[in-house]
Amino acid sequence: MSYISLEKLKNAWIFKHKSLPIKDTDLPKIKPMAKDRANVLWDAFISRQVDHPDFFKKGDWPFNDNNWHEQGKWEGIWDSNEEDLPELITTHIAWDNNTVVYYCSNRDNVIETTWAVFKRCWKNFLFMDDGCILVGKKRKESVQFNSNGTFKVGTKPS
């Protein structure tokens, strides 16, 4: 099985938070991966060395500062009534709405959705902000969200 139900996700409450409702049509498009599939994706797209962003080290592309181009702040926008992602992110990422994206929290926790759904529900996803990395399928652009309210936009090497 490639996915688990949203209800079985450890922190499923983030997608059911009353102050940040998600459309019924978007919920089925938020697909937590089963552990085995998450492990394979993490190893392929994020790191073969470590299982969590806190432990990135030399040899992990996210550890290399040259892969990150700019930094911005997300927390103020997250706390506001503004619904759109920070402009730096939407300027850096020009993906089609149907692009498959992966929100990678750690080796065992990867959530697949589309770019359109992520843009609409980003505030829900950012309840998990501990260095999580957003990457697109067959795309080089990436974003890392940090718990201090900042993010970095960059390019994942081929």
Which sequence ranges carry the predicted segments?
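Structured alpha/beta or helical-core interaction and ligand-binding surfaces enriched in interleaved
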Residues: 1-150, 155-158
